[in-house]
Amino acid sequence: MVQLSRRGLLQKTGISAIAATGFAGCLGRGGGSLDSVTVAYVPIFPNMQHYVMEQEGYYEDVPRDVTVERFSSGPSVVKAFASGDVDVALFGITPAMVLADRGKEAGILAANSKNGFKIMGTTELAERYDQDGPATFERFEQEKGRKIRFGAPPDGSVPDIVLRYWIQEDLGVGEMASTINKSKVPPARAVQTIQSGDLDATIIQEPFATIIGQDERFGELAWSGDILSNHPVTVLFASQQVLDDSELAQSLVEQHTAATQFTAESPDTAAAHAASVIGSGVSEELATTAMDSQASDYISDPHAITDQATTMSEFVANVGNIEQPVGTENLFAFDPYDAIQE
């Protein structure tokens, strides 16, 4: 059974934070198996499986009551997950690394998406990069008297890590801080910010990359799948209590895998589901167009992202969001996925 968001329910009934704590306790957060499970998600395109699972009724087949809760950002999910308010989350892999680094007993059950960004810039910059490649950065600064202005989410976020890898490892043009002028711009604001002329470039996910690409003033410099091939974007992350309940964990992965298959076979319908849940200016037409992008790449197999997760973890540690790189054994829970493959 899929229920209303607990947060929305509490707001509607005016229950205090103290009562909320008691209510959470009633949902089986003590020892033993869970009677219900709270699934948190961030409303972004890379979490496509969630929209399919919710709209197609796949959560109904999970053998526990499912409560779905929407969060505005990865950090807000990290806080809720760390405090035990949610059991399962669909969010970026770097927030999962932060939780693992903090000692939270949990693991990645499935991958959601990979290769999910495009580096978009002004037509002038895109043409210059096409011609000059890595030398673009130095020549731009020589001619303009300033560094390229890049918009990206906060340090240590998935797109930030991919951007760092591109500049420092793929292109080898130096440390990011000395190569570009980075502004912290959330994905939802990137389109407006670059169109207003405040940015020269941005690293952006779908469907925002499609919006920018439809404007003749802008072009594509690079696709993240060519920068760090098969890098993860978002994941399905579960608490230890979920992992200990093999029936529940396997069911979540089974429904997730079914949603990935549904997305591959019926991309237009999946796009419509995403648009209906995300809202915020994401129309069905835009979502459908964005599904044709290289940056719309959905998977479930957690084994497919382990190598690049290790690489990304090193960068997250260098940024300072985690104390040291998180090992695969401390980040992934492969058994439920492997069990349903047998």
Where do the PLM segments sit?
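N-terminal secretory signal peptides and thylakoid transit peptides that target proteins
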Residues: 1-22
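Short, well-ordered beta-strand elements
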Residues: 32-44, 64-70, 147-151, 181-183
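Short, polar/charged alpha-helical segment
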Residues: 43-71, 75-76, 97-102, 161-170, ...
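Short helix-initiation/N-cap motifs at beta->coil->alpha
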Residues: 45, 68-79, 91-94, 175-196, ...
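A conserved helix-loop-strand patch within extracytoplasmic ligand-binding domains
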Residues: 112-183, 240
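Pocket-lining segment of extracytoplasmic ligand-binding domains
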Residues: 186-276
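Secondary-structure end/capping motifs
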Residues: 244-322
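Conserved C-terminal helix/tail region of periplasmic/extracytoplasmic solute-binding proteins
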Residues: 313-342
